[in-house]
Structure formats: structure tokens, C-alpha cells
């Protein structure tokens, strides 16, 4: 995703959850973290197959580090990765013109305020409930109980994200045709999934 999309989703995730109060973060530093991985060109391609260690390391940093400055930045970086994990351009190995076109059009539509999360949100919620239940949490979608039984919270969060990424790819497989890079529907889907996952993972980090 382009920087404006990362910033917009990061801001919404912050406003629509208790992240800001629970973590006592610096908003400007957090927002910089939301775009930082795209500034450092040494980083690998931002899909879930290329960055599992980096993602888990940042989850662990949120648990161990007490510095408000570092935690604010790290949370933003986590949100950046989540946005890219649920963006088709980062999942279909599209490195060239189509990737660039998709991001440019998304940026344009965001500026015109033509993009809002679509009705796939209910489907995302049902997949999330399945994801939590699939990890043998007694058939409940109570995420706090799920995490209490886990020793390595960072690994478990990553596995939930990975599960959801697989569901996302299955969902968009039949929808994304040759013209996916200009599809407004695909942009709606990506924004819906990205925002939902940023909110849920943010809640898990503070659990």
C-alpha cells in the first residue's frame, strides 16, 4: 500500500480501539512507524512469507520494551506489515507496473475520499471467530482466554494472522481477475481486511 493508505488505516485503528490509552503512545512517532518500512529499501518484500521473523520480533519488542518512544514506533511498523499482508499487490508477487498502478489508483481514490471499507467486513469477522476457535480455545471466541493458555503470545498472534491471510487469499482468488489492479472492489476488500486486522492485533498486543 502507499503511504496515505498506511497512515489512514493506522489512524483509524488508533481511533477506533483503546490502543492510544492502553499503550500511552506518541501519535506522531506511531504514524511514522506506519510508513517506515517503505522508507528502508533494505527490507524484504512485505508479504507474510518474507517477513515472519521481523513481524514476530516486533511483537516481542512490544512485550519487552518499556520505552514509550520505541513502543510507539514499533506498533506503527506492525500496523504497516498487517496492511501489506492483506493487500493483494503484496500477495500475488506483483512487483512491476500493476503493483504501481494499483497503489497509485488507491492513493488517488483515498484523496478523493472515494474508498470506504465494504460489506466484506462481516465475512472477515466470521473468519476471525473461526481462527480463534481453531486453536482449541474451548469453542469460544474469547480472545483473552485463548491467550492466557499460551506461553508465547507473539507466536500465537502471528499464527492467527497467518490463518487470516490464508482466508483472505482464498476469498480474493475468485474475485481478482486480470484487471485487479484497477478494481475498486479489490481496494474496498483490502481496506476492510487491513483495518480489521490492525484493530484486532492491536487489541491482542494490549491483552
Could you tell me what each predicted segment is?
Residues 1-77, 82-207:
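N-terminal leader/auxiliary helical segments
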Amino acid at each position: 500500500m502507499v503511504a496515505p493508505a498506511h497512515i489512514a488505516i493506522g489512524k483509524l485503528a488508533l481511533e477506533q480501539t483503546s490502543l492510544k490509552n492502553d499503550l500511552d503512545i506518541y501519535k506522531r512517532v506511531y504514524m511514522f512507524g506506519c510508513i517506515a518500512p517503505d522508507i528502508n529499501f533494505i527490507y524484504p518484500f512485505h508479504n507474510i512469507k518474507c517477513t515472519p521473523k521481523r513481524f514476530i520480533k516486533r511483537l516481542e519488542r512490544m512485550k519487552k520494551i518499556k520505552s514509550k518512544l520505541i513502543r510507539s514506533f514499533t506498533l506503527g511498523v506492525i500496523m504497516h506489515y498487517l496492511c501489506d499482508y492483506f493487500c493483494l499487490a503484496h500477495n500475488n508477487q506483483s512487483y512491476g507496473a500493476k503493483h504501481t498502478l494499483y497503489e497509485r489508483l488507491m492513493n488517488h481514490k483515498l484523496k478523493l475520499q472515494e474508498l470506504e471499507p465494504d460489506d466484506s467486513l462481516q465475512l472477515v469477522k466470521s473468519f476471525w471467530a473461526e481462527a480463534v476457535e481453531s486453536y482449541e480455545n474451548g469453542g469460544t471466541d474469547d480472545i483473552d482466554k485463548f491467550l492466557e493458555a499460551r506461553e508465547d503470545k507473539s507466536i500465537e498472534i502471528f499464527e492467527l494472522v497467518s490463518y487470516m491471510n490464508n482466508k483472505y487469499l482464498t476469498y480474493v482468488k475468485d474475485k481478482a481477475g486480470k484487471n485487479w489492479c484497477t478494481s475498486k472492489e479489490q481496494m474496498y476488500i483490502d481496506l476492510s481486511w487491513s483495518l480489521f486486522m490492525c484493530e484486532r492485533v492491536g487489541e491482542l498486543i494490549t491483552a
